[in-house]
């Protein structure tokens, strides 16, 4: 939005050309989203408390969580507002990737918002049925996959790449649609499952999003992409503004979500953030890197799958409780210890993911 204005003004004063630089707009995206979160956050929390939009807590979970009942939820709306405003202000709005990523994020946020609303309306922690939620996630996921497939402007956009092996490139053809659906919906649910402790999901999301900003910037630059042996995807570089906005909004939200949390993001935030990471991985052609950097999300999801399968087949549980973070809580780990250790693991995994840029 502002980019068009600055392009017009640069005809009268060349100093406005500085806003053409992606790095500057990314920094401004971070700061804008961060400021919005700081300014709007307190008022939103007060309003959520006023209307009694509070968290519904499972009675079969760790007993320490019972004190969280009534804490304002749906704070993820703050993240979405900050990301949307910042992205629209500083991105090149003629870029198709910007619109795809932003719309996927907002649509998954809408699904999560409806889920949160139903939990509040009926006074329990169930919300939408798993089948209904999965159906609408799949609708958006498949629609996005089909859109990306039929608007692809180069073969690289539908090719599967394997990190560490620069010569391994598999042209997916129509299978790209299935992979894209799986990555977006899978990432969305993985982040949602991880969002069970104060700040547990948002910090890894910020770290992974920041790393994808690096991948987007390098993949959108022909010289850098060729030097590093990564896919060159024209136009994807402008997503560094979106990832910057996501980092800024996430840090701003963490200010209020850090232990002990003043607000929870709810499904409106968790489903949206996971979908955002998924679609970022798809358009930068770094699906495997998402699995590496988002290892915490992957393990949390696998713990749930393993728990369910084991119980159905043998009647026994592998973990004291799933997702995995609850297992450690029931082992006696204080909540802050679980959170920070999962953060540390994510930092390490993100560094490993970034290292794949050079190890090819």
Swiss-Prot record:
Catalysed conversion reaction: UDP-N-acetyl-alpha-D-muramoyl-L-alanyl-gamma-D-glutamyl-meso-2,6-diaminopimeloyl-D-alanyl-D-alanine + di-trans,octa-cis-undecaprenyl phosphate = di-trans,octa-cis-undecaprenyl diphospho-N-acetyl-alpha-D-muramoyl-L-alanyl-D-glutamyl-meso-2,6-diaminopimeloyl-D-alanyl-D-alanine + UMP
Listed GO biological process terms: cell division; cell wall organization; peptidoglycan biosynthetic process; regulation of cell shape
Entry membrane topology: Multi-pass membrane protein
A GO term for molecular function: UDP-N-acetylmuramoyl-L-alanyl-D-glutamyl-meso-2,6-diaminopimelyl-D-alanyl-D-alanine:undecaprenyl-phosphate transferase activity
Lineage: Bacteria, Pseudomonadati, Pseudomonadota, Gammaproteobacteria, Chromatiales
Recorded family membership: Belongs to the glycosyltransferase 4 family. MraY subfamily.
Name assigned to this protein: Phospho-N-acetylmuramoyl-pentapeptide-transferase
UniProt pathway: Cell wall biogenesis; peptidoglycan biosynthesis
InterPro entries: Glycosyl_transferase_4, PNAcMuramoyl-5peptid_Trfase, PNAcMuramoyl-5peptid_Trfase_CS
Cofactor: Mg(2+)
Keyword Magnesium: yes
Subcellular location: Cell inner membrane
GO CC annotations on file: plasma membrane
Residue ranges of the TM segments: 26-46, 70-90, 97-117, 134-154, 168-188, 199-219, 236-256, 263-283, 288-308, 338-358
Chief subcellular location: membrane
Function in brief: Catalyzes the initial step of the lipid cycle reactions in the biosynthesis of the cell wall peptidoglycan: transfers peptidoglycan precursor phospho-MurNAc-pentapeptide from UDP-MurNAc-pentapeptide onto the lipid carrier undecaprenyl phosphate, yielding undecaprenyl-pyrophosphoryl-MurNAc-pentapeptide, known as lipid I.
């Amino acid at each position: 939005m502002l980019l068009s204005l600055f392009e017009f003004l640069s005809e009268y004063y060349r100093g406005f050309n500085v806003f053409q630089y992606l790095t500057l707009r990314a920094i401004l995206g971070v700061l804008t989203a961060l400021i919005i979160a700081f300014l709007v956050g307190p008022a939103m929390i007060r309003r959520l408390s006023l209307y009694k939009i509070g968290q519904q807590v499972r009675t079969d979970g760790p007993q320490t969580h019972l004190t969280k009942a009534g804490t304002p939820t749906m704070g993820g709306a703050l993240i979405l507002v900050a990301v949307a405003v910042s992205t629209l202000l500083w991105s090149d709005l003629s870029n198709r990737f910007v619109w795809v990523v932003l719309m996927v994020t907002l649509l998954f946020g809408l699904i999560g918002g409806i889920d949160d609303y139903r939990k509040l309306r009926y006074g329990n922690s169930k919300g939408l049925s798993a089948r209904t939620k999965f159906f609408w996630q799949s609708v958006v996921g498949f629609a996005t996959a089909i859109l990306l497939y039929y608007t692809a402007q180069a073969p690289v956009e539908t090719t599967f790449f394997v990190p560490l092996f620069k010569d391994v490139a598999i042209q997916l053809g129509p299978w790209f649609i299935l992979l894209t659906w799986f990555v977006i919906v899978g990432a969305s649910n993985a982040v949602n499952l991880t969002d069970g402790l104060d700040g547990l999901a948002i910090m890894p999301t910020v770290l992974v999003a920041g790393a994808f900003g690096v991948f987007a910037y390098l993949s959108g630059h022909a010289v850098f992409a060729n030097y590093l042996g990564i896919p060159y995807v024209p136009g994807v570089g402008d997503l560094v503004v979106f990832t910057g906005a996501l980092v800024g909004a996430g840090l701003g939200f963490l200010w209020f979500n850090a232990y002990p949390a003043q607000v929870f993001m709810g499904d409106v935030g968790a489903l949206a953030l996971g979908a955002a990471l998924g679609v970022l991985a798809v358009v930068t052609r770094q699906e495997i890197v998402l699995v590496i950097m988002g290892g915490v999300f992957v393990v949390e999801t696998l713990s749930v799958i393993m728990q369910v399968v084991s119980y159905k087949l043998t009647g026994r549980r592998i973990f004291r409780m799933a997702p995995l973070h609850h297992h450690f809580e029931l082992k006696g780990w204080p909540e802050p210890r679980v959170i920070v250790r999962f953060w540390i693991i994510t930092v390490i995994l993100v560094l490993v993911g970034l290292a794949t840029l050079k190890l090819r």
